[in-house]
């Protein structure tokens, strides 16, 4: 799954490589990141290596990194999962380095990948899940055109309370209607 060009004006976007693993592990293990994920377990180097081998050889999952063009700093990781070429849909997600949040990078990465998935890969539907407490992400997803499709009520225990897991989806026709 080759990407068009190599990113955006501010970001180099490419497949995750072994040289990225330590920074990506630190991002995953950061408390602010874990609060937003469905999986709350810290990852060791050994666990990450096994995971990397699996995702590197997968036909249905990919991981990409976004790095700032000016200094090669890691901005975030974009997840593509459950890629179903027969039904033309996939699940996506992103983790942004805490110091890089609220600077428009998540929107930039999502817009880049949505263009790619709908225009180049011919996907019909892109979906994601997020926690109700992740209000910034929910606002971004709605801004991008994602629609809430359902909830798993009180499915996730975070920060001392149960909260819903929100399923959102975006269809190609909805994306094209927004972007022309």
PLM regions: where:
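Conserved active-site tyrosine of GNAT-family acetyltransferases
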Residues: 141, 146, 168
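A short, well-structured alpha-helix characteristic of acyl/acetyltransferase catalytic modules
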Residues: 1-50, 174-180
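Conserved GNAT acetyl-CoA-binding A-motif
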Residues: 119-129
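Conserved G/P- and acidic residue-centered "switch" motifs that form tight phosphate/ATP-binding loops
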Residues: 72, 104, 134, 160
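Conserved acetyl-CoA-binding loop-helix of GNAT-fold acetyltransferases
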Residues: 102-116, 135-143
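Acetyl-CoA-dependent GNAT
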Residues: 41-101, 171-175
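Conserved catalytic-core motifs of GNAT/GCN5-like acyltransferases
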Residues: 127-130, 147-163
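Terminal substrate-recognition subdomain of acyl/acetyltransferases
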Residues: 2-3, 154, 159-180
């Amino acid at each position: 799954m080759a990407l068009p060009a190599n990113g955006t004006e501010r970001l180099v976007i490419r497949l995750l490589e072994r040289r990225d693993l330590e920074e990506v592990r630190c991002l995953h293990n950061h408390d602010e990141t874990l609060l937003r994920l469905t999986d709350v377990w810290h990852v060791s180097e050994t666990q990450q290596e096994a995971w990397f081998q699996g995702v590197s050889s997968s036909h249905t999952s990919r991981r990409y990194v976004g790095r700032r063009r000016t200094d090669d700093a890691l901005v975030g990781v974009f997840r593509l999962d459950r890629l179903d070429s027969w039904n033309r849909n996939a699940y996506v997600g992103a983790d942004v380095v805490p110091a890089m949040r609220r600077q428009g990078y998540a929107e930039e990465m999502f817009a880049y990948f949505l263009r790619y998935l709908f225009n180049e890969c011919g996907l019909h539907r892109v979906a994601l899940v997020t926690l109700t407490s992740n209000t910034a992400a929910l606002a971004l997803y709605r801004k991008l055109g994602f629609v809430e499709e359902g909830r798993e009520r009180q499915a996730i225990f975070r920060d001392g309370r149960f909260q819903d897991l929100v399923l959102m989806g975006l269809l190609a026709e909805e994306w094209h209607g927004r972007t022309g």
